[in-house]
Amino acid sequence: MFQDNPLLAQLKQQLHTQTPRVEGVVKGTEKGFGFLEVDGQKSYFIPPPQMKKVMHGDRIIATLHTDKDREIAEPETLVEPFLSRFVGRVQRKDDRLSIVPDHPLLRDAIQCRPVRELTHSFQNGDWVVAEMCRHPLKGDRAFQADLTAFITNGEDHFVPWWVTLARHNLEREAPAMVESALNDAELEREDLTALNFVTIDSASTEDMDDALFVQDNGDGSWLLTIAIADPTAYVVENSELDLTARKRAFTNYLPGFNIPMLPRDLSDNLCSLRPNERRPVLVCRVTITEEGTLSNDIRFSAAWVESKAKLVYDDVSDWLEGNNRWQPQDTAIAEQITLLKRICDARSNWRQQHALVFKDRPDYRFLLGEKGEVLDIIVEHRRIANRIVEECMIAANVCAALALREHLGFGIYNVHTGFDPALVEQAASVLKANGVDADPQALLTLPGFCELRRHLDALPTQFLDSRIRRFQTFAEISTVPGPHFGLGLEAYATWTSPIRKYGDMVNHRLLKAMITGQQAEKPQEEITVQLAERRRLNRMAERDVGDWLYARYLQPQAGTDTRFTAEIIDITRGGLRVRLLDNGAVAFIPAPFIHAVRDEVVCSQETGTVQIKGETVYSQSDKIEVRIAEVRMETRNVIARPVA
């Protein structure tokens, strides 16, 4: 009777149209229910039965209903699934496979099956790559995934590395070597092999890509020659090797080992500036005045050099600091070290007055055993030899930025524009509330930004510095020149690490075109997108492996009385994020660990403070003592508790 009834169809359509709908992102909880967060402002309750249709992180459209004075969201349409490609662990039960995604808020096993090409016999605990293929909001009965790749078994000691690389879809191996010979016969090279070039690196470094030589001009100035390894002499543009390097974009440095951008025979041998080996290079010569100014006589050329010594950071630093456990091999090398130290001091003073100098932060290096276990974490402070190399490389990159800008008008530039114009008023308000008057428009200029940074660096704590960082833009990679506010420089283009960075290889080719007077093509914008994306993925991979190793390292300390000094690096509504200064690990302190009565404690990201009953007890950048309360190995989270 009601079949094909137009009135009934009209009524259904009317009800459907009148039902309120919202679009948002599903937030799961450990208790089965969830919330639909809309624009970060409002959230709606999703009951457990409805949560079975969705997954944490899904973007959906939901209908809104009222139940006992509470608005409830009922998932209706999938806009964008949270999971597409992911990694997880296999569960095997009676020949039936399921996979638990490796994510802190995804605990439920998902039915899965291997794709036809995958012949591996899966066992409990295996790590795999999977692709979601079914979703309840797409009309399927349940979630289902296809297993697309086997990563490793659950007992592999190197799980942190292999799983992380698979998660971010990054290479595990060095590229294969192909037949390579010098291919730039038309490029005239000066013979500088008689000069006393030296390299300064870590003791374990094999891919030495920069060598330095200084000549004292006798009038208080120096002529600095920076020689940079020349892989583009072997790698033809658009060749198989070049396309591989372009895809990888960077050498991927992970705790314990690296995955190079170029084949190891190139990066660690043919191109590496090994001592007493003749190597093709690009060189930059520039006069540096006694005050540290770069003169206008910048000159780039191609050359042959022969490094006379592979020096090590700690050896050089010890010798310059008067510790004579190590000595330079001869007076010529000793003279080079002494002259490089003078250049470093002059350039550092110039940058402090006219640009910006980053505050020294230690590096943390994992000392690993044969099975990937963390034996120790070494704190490596930046010493004078590190600063020598840093000052010379910054000078070289400024020279390239200016030369490319003047001769070509393009290149691969590192650009940082300081404050976001949309947020600069907020930054000025935060500064004013903390006793610093700043004109928002002046903050958007390079001199204004530098003046503020110098003022903040002179303050006794980093509280204000950390508070205004969120109003700043991120550094970008650009094909056109632009300022680098973070360094306080009007232009910055790197070319000093072409073995490790594809953008530097691009700049090498442009510099060669400039040297020979040939026509040069502006790099495609797609290259900057690829470089930025790969840089992001490599950083995430380094962080993820680090988190895993920190969790392993700190697990024995959980629940003990061992104290750690920590710096508060972030304050969120739920608690504090701190960095342990002894080893670099990041831990979370939940708000209830700060004060038992939850309503009396306010953790505010806005003010960068924690207040108990209206009194400020902690501020961002404070140093506090903590103990490790718990290490959650499945999520690699370290939970800490303040020492009372």
UniProtKB/Swiss-Prot annotation:
Q: Which class of enzymes does this protein belong to?
A: hydrolase
Q: Where in the cell is it found?
A: Cytoplasm
User: What superkingdom does the record give?
Assistant: Bacteria
Pull one GO CC term from this UniProt entry.
cytosol
* Reactions the enzyme catalyzes: Exonucleolytic cleavage in the 3'- to 5'-direction to yield nucleoside 5'-phosphates
* Primary location group: cytoplasm
Query: What sequence ranges are listed for the domain S1 motif?
Result: 561-643
**Known EC number:** 3.1.13.1
InterPro entries xrefs = CSD (IPR011129), NA-bd_OB-fold (IPR012340), RNase_B_OB_dom (IPR013223), RNase_II (IPR011804), RNase_II/R (IPR001900), RNase_II/R_CS (IPR022966), RNase_II/RNase_R (IPR004476), RNR_Ribonuclease (IPR050180)
Keyword list, A-Z: Cytoplasm, Exonuclease, Hydrolase, Nuclease, RNA-binding
The UniProt GO MF terms for this protein read:
exoribonuclease II activity; RNA binding
Q: Any idea where the RNB domain is?
A: 189-516
GO biological process, alphabetically ordered: mRNA catabolic process
Asked if the keyword Cell membrane belongs to this entry, the reply reads: no
Cytoplasm listed as a keyword: yes
Please name the NCBIfam families in this protein's record: 3_prime_RNase, PRK05054.1, RNase_B
Describe the task this protein carries out: Involved in mRNA degradation. Hydrolyzes single-stranded polyribonucleotides processively in the 3' to 5' direction.
Q: Which family does it belong to?
A: Belongs to the RNR ribonuclease family. RNase II subfamily.
Quote the protein name from its UniProt record: Exoribonuclease 2
| Gene name of this polypeptide | rnb
